[in-house]
């Protein structure tokens, strides 16, 4: 492989370090902060040079899609397989949840955090503390499997009457549905009809 400049070595070593500790690569912003580069354009330039020199491989259509190229100098890196899961920024009635217009970004998840077909998985960023007693905190990412049915007690993502996604525990009662927050200070939501979007199957939290 071709020799790296000092800055390229800093970036390359930082990427390796993050992959070793987290199992997935850092974002361009994180790389810039780590090596003291304010411009994402400059970081992209260094990443392009690293790719040209055969140290990394990238996918320009996906953020964080950086792979360390295995060779004699780094074949001891323990890279966990990752999948790039769509992060849903909004949910629109009548539009498939993973429609392009709903996707804010793609987030790399260690593959062991999912247990189903990757195409059925999406992520929602949790806002608020309505599920704190279930261990779901503000700022967490919930891993969701797309489905339109649920069983009593499931933690689901549902569409509210205001066309917003909400994470609650699902209960079907005699003549209505109850969406129960896991926060003893909050009241349940009662609905005549409920649009189930998916079931929460996992949680990701950055420490």
From Swiss-Prot:
Record-level GO BP terms: DNA repair; DNA replication; negative regulation of DNA-templated transcription; proteolysis; SOS response
CDD domains assigned to the protein according to its UniProt record, in alphabetical order: HTH_ARSR (cd00090), S24_LexA-like (cd06529)
Gene3D superfamilies: Umud Fragment, subunit A (2.10.109.10), Winged helix-like DNA-binding domain superfamily/Winged helix DNA-binding domain (1.10.10.10)
Catalytic activity: Hydrolysis of Ala-|-Gly bond in repressor LexA
Marked site: Cleavage: 93-94
Gene Ontology MF terms in the entry: DNA binding; serine-type endopeptidase activity
Family of the protein in this entry: Belongs to the peptidase S24 family.
Chain's role: Represses a number of genes involved in the response to DNA damage (SOS response), including recA and lexA. In the presence of single-stranded DNA, RecA interacts with LexA causing an autocatalytic cleavage which disrupts the DNA-binding part of LexA, leading to derepression of the SOS regulon and eventually DNA repair.
Subunit and interaction comment: Homodimer.
Protein name: LexA repressor
UniProt source species: Staphylococcus aureus (strain Newman)
Gene it is expressed from: lexA
